[in-house]
Amino acid sequence: MLRVGRTTEQQLLLGEWACLGVLYPTPTHGFAIAARLKPGGDVGRVWSLSRALTYRSLEQLAVRGFIQAVGEEPGIAGGNRTILAATRTGRAQLRKWLAAPVVHQRDLRSELLLKLIIADICNIDIDEMLELQRAGVAVMSEALTAQIEADPSDVVTLWRNESSNAALRFLDRLPRPHA
């Protein structure tokens, strides 16, 4: 099987975006990032990663030049912990990712929620993206409603329509501190 490497920022996995988002506001070590990405962590509530996958994501971010080692501190169980920080490029790519609406309805639950959590952690205003997101979901919802009217027995389209309507209600209920 041929494996093609990922080369662009849009090809980052959600776990990599989550790690970059945790590093954006302040440098820290991988163990602390992994703790935030546990299922009960502030970011892990939306997108959780095992410690091994967290470190793999950090390696991928370093290879792309989105994060770098900036120091060390003593570890609790011996050895030193490497302190990592988002690079200027990494910070710019994260802001660009946060500014882009989620394209596919199937990704709204995971990617949109992750963007909301990361934007809050990083104190980045995403109001414009949310307006674009709402407009895109509204267009999708209108098209699905028309399809349902044409064929009310299509359960897949009915499901997608109900999901898009729920997404619209969710987007409408979000607090807008910058509005």
Model regions and ranges:
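Short, flexible helix-adjacent loops and helix caps
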Residues: 42, 72, 99, 121, ...
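Juxtamembrane/interface motifs at transmembrane-helix termini
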Residues: 52-55, 113-115, 147-150
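Short, charged/polar low-complexity linear motifs in solvent-exposed/disordered segments
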Residues: 87, 110-113, 173-174
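Amphipathic alpha-helical dimerization/coiled-coil segments
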Residues: 95-135, 139-142
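Charged, low-complexity intrinsically disordered regulatory/assembly segments
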Residues: 124, 128-130, 137-179
